[in-house]
């Protein structure tokens, strides 16, 4: 591994690009704390009130809630088309922030594969979001549950769109970490989804040296967040090495389709190499 390869995919500063404005951010921050408190309060109230409603009602109300609290979600497809396009499929997305689940939960039929969450705040927020959106999740670390869920899904795939982030780590939006095939080779078609996030003040959503709670709070206090989800053409399910290539070659094709759409490189840098690089910076 070359450090230059990892550096390409990691932000090292909190503010990036021509629009960076740390002074304006500092002036905004006290008001941002109030915005964060309002967002959490509204989410708690909404989650309690919406529980008696159907999943479909929860989904559409959740989208309105996000808009109300300053989180905009747009897509190249309308709600019903997304539902048809992703039904029974694995939806593979690039991973760009600790808030990626916010827009994914607004999508029809969405079930998320969830890893560990670093902070208590993240766990509480995740609980509220899943309850409020009517979505389900599969815990990656619970192998017994995963085996059971995949067995059930194989028998009856209709009504579930499984959202995954095959990089298994967050990139800096200027390139993709290599996709892991174990997220994608599941006997179901794969729908690549190219996700982008726009933030004010030139904020970086994922500085490599920031803690999980710091990244979470910066996004929560941001005046606006704009996620855009572009659903790409479906890639047929993996069949065999003779027909689909090796599992890793299959995953590379999914990665390449997203990278090409976003106009960024699809690298072979792995999550493990990023973790090694970050650990080396702390020595």
Each model region followed by its residue ranges:
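Residue-level preference for the first positions of well-ordered beta-strands
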Residues: 88-90, 110, 159-165, 189
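A membrane-cytosol interface segment of integral membrane proteins
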Residues: 134-154, 165-169
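Short amphipathic C-terminal alpha-helix that caps PH/PH-like domains
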Residues: 250-261
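Membrane-anchoring hydrophobic helices of lipid-metabolizing enzymes
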Residues: 1-89
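Catalytic core of membrane glycerolipid acyltransferases/transacylases, capturing the structured
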Residues: 42-47, 51-60, 67-68, 72, ...
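Soluble, non-transmembrane catalytic domains of enzymes that act on hydrophobic metabolites at membranes
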Residues: 1-16, 74-78, 101-102, 112-114, ...
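A cross-family acyltransferase "interaction/gating" segment
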Residues: 124, 160, 172-245, 274-280
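Short amphipathic alpha-helix with an adjacent loop that forms part of the alpha/beta core around
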Residues: 77-85, 147-157
